[in-house]
């Protein structure tokens, strides 16, 4: 069967659609945000494909797999087993790295265990165990006739006269020994100074090199190795200064005896006690109480320079008072003006020195005690270590910072594992290379003999997997990069690379916007990868808005015509050209140029005197860059993937602004020199795509603050007042008005053991979340449940006479969310929808015109028409005098910005510089800018 037939799909907002898709093709599903693309791709096709495959397994196996809900569809024919690659961040486990997720690290561990050469950490000598035959062969390779002696080092740098050692050697029949580098007969030894360190090597054999010595040498080596615990020396007989050769029969340093057991893959795993650094347990970082977060240096101790140790906490404040009296400093002096010595005593303690403390007990008596002062930091460390309360830990964690582990310097591995070499690099050195460079290194690595044979297969796997990561535009990442620092787009492309590495055939892959976070330049490589996946013999279904991806597809499905209740229908399907020619397809209109996002006729000029100036930013790969952001304009930060955009804006500019303007104490900015210009602003808002809530109880009404006035309206109805109902009666989070059978969830979870848990509608309230008495209260003929079921569009009309509500509902409509329900569960909102709910909350606040808004890729999940709406909102914020900074790859957003900052020139270590600044027109003329290169034809086309 060469087709996938879908009949009667009604999942979520799909309106009983019938669809026939070709198999083994690249299919793009597009349409407005919220039109039903994910409902078709993930909740129907993927859910059914995965469910059928899992159902073919035994009941025992099924209990270990999470099964998806059966989609609401009549029939689907021609399905293959399905694999979905979504945008979710990979892992929040601090032990996950790019290397471990892609499994490249497992191959690297195997490579280093099987062909690695351990070296002594102190003397840099290879620790190689040799057999006696190998030792004999090496000696016989010397020029014939060479006079040599074989020595056994019996004492190494030890104090004493060592008389017992010499007696033992004489008893065994030895005649000569070398003491501190000089040869002596054992009967004519000098007296040794027992206060000094000495080295003694006994002469086991003296010989001239010739071919028939094999048997004699083997016996002599055996004797020497037995005497000196596996170590033997060969030195020239006549030349005391001559170079000697050290032989070892075990993995040990012949100089200091540093030994290592046989190399095993577990020695290179930081998730195994055998390989993890014992200081940081393989995490690479140590937590510490950061005094910068702990102390407000501008306040006095009495005012609360250290939270919890001010006047309000009598016990601790009495302690500080006694300490101040003992050391002679004032509690009324700003902490920053106290001497360094006094600051150290307060924070780190008085050591062993006792201090006289006076405490006022509950009865008003003064109690005197003399003891050392623990210090605020040790006090917090002890409380953090000993407490069993999660709340206390959470509170104290706000003051914790992290720093690289002092022992392993962030490499996570123990000392032995850090000193094993393959070629010219250790394992930490390889994992610290950008993937592109690591790929080149292993591609050129040549190992000879037995090692070469063993390594060949492992190297082939490593090189292939690294190349797949390069192909999806991730050549700038390093293998030791922590997984929780990856963006959604990066995480998805890593999964994509892993799937290509698996080389499966006949599978249905479903991807969710793989182009997120990719610069136009890297997009071509990604599309080639998707084609490669299709050419292997797979059906590749992509939910995508990217123009290039739609044009390249074999088959396009456009869902619409609107979003939410207005969507869920197939508007157009067929080749890209057929969709472009379709009169009703919104996507087709934008692709064919009948509709377009217009470039502003003129740019808002910048005022050079009003700028945010960030100097010397050095976080991650940033190379001491100076950033200037014009105040009151829409600035777009662009650059290829991995060039340092997020580090510059999210990790440096935002924490600095949030600390200065919002008083955030738990945010730490990446290294930089100075920040200027924040005095022109009054607050900063970071609008990201994280969920607005992680439980079904969170919804747009609660998040935007609409629900409170709605509950107040219901509590003000005469019937409510006569019954004594307050606003709390209409909350489904507290007892009173909610249905107690389902605790206000509307659903009841039923555990099904080896089948997926199912949520069944609550029998008591019929999914309405409230009890019967609460639902009897009506406002304008509707009860609270019916209001929550309204779409934003309907609610706007319904509450038209309530200005506070009408304004907030209007802003939700302005950001393109007219179709979502007021009470829609936050867990069902896409990333783009969650971001727009946050945007609307900001828009509905009273505007001071002095806010800095930061958005990271706000076009994720947005169709051309949605982008137009988003731009209208951003321009509206800008027109009110606010400063908007957007990190973006979408050329439609870039071309409408007032000012561009382009980072590059490449990603990773080859990036981290600001290579161009200016208006879109200026940037398009700059040869060094990749963004300008793609922007130029677009501006020319739009101006035409």
UniProtKB/Swiss-Prot annotation:
The keyword Repeat applies. PROSITE patterns: ABC_TRANSPORTER_1, ABC_TRANSPORTER_2. Its main location: cytoplasm. One of its GO terms (molecular function) is excinuclease ABC activity. ATP binds at residues 31-38, 639-646. One of its GO terms (biological process) is nucleotide-excision repair. The UvrABC repair system catalyzes the recognition and processing of DNA lesions. UvrA is an ATPase and a DNA-binding protein. A damage recognition complex composed of 2 UvrA and 2 UvrB subunits scans DNA for abnormalities. When the presence of a lesion has been verified by UvrB, the UvrA molecules dissociate. Belongs to the ABC transporter superfamily. UvrA family. This is UvrABC system protein A.
